[in-house]
Amino acid sequence: DIVMTQAAFSNPVTLGTSASFSCRSSKSLQQSKGITYLYWYLQKPGQSPQLLIYQMSNLASGVPDRFSGSGSGTDFTLRISRVEAEDVGVYYCANLQELPYTFGGGTKLEIK
């Protein structure tokens, strides 16, 4: 199985500043066609996870363009350019390259 690794907590950030989340996979998530099957989800308190980014860098429908995704085959970053209070929650990266699909342990966004 592909192992997805994330830090449990982010560095505390101030509202209006940027935040970054890192994720590493134990195997490349890039297919031969060049598509990278790395997905990012946000689980807000008391809610189900919502898709933020698909195929490493594509913004899901309805997600503010404050969010962006980047990376390589195994190392990935989710960035929020201007953190808002509504962004609080746990951010998960996921391997949708091969079964079984696997998730990182999640990184909790900490606000100062």
Swiss-Prot record:
In alphabetical order, the GO MF annotations are: antigen binding
Q: Which SUPFAM superfamilies match?
A: Immunoglobulin
Could you list this entry's UniProt keywords, alphabetically sorted: Adaptive immunity, Disulfide bond, Immunity, Immunoglobulin, Monoclonal antibody
Q: Where is this region: Framework-3?
A: 62-93
Q: Note down the stretches annotated as region Complementarity-determining-1.
A: 24-39
Question: Region Framework-2: start and end of each range?
Answer: 40-54
Q: Where is this region: Complementarity-determining-3?
A: 94-102
Per the UniProt entry, what are the Gene Ontology biological process annotations, in alphabetical order? Answer: adaptive immune response; immune response
Q: Where is this region: Framework-4?
A: 103-112
> Does Amino-acid biosynthesis count among this protein's keywords?
no
For the region Framework-1, what residue ranges are annotated?
Answer: 1-23
- Disulfides per UniProt: 23-93
Q: Which InterPro entries match?
A: Ig-like_dom (IPR007110), Ig-like_dom_sf (IPR036179), Ig-like_fold (IPR013783), Ig_sub (IPR003599), Ig_V-set (IPR013106), IgV_Light_Chain (IPR050150)
Region: Complementarity-determining-2, residue numbers: 55-61
This entry carries the following GO cellular component terms, namely: immunoglobulin complex
- Kindly give any further remark recorded in the entry: This chain is from a hybridoma-derived monoclonal antibody against the streptococcal group A polysaccharide.
UniProt name for this protein: Ig kappa chain V-II region 2S1.3
Q: Which organism is it from?
A: Mus musculus
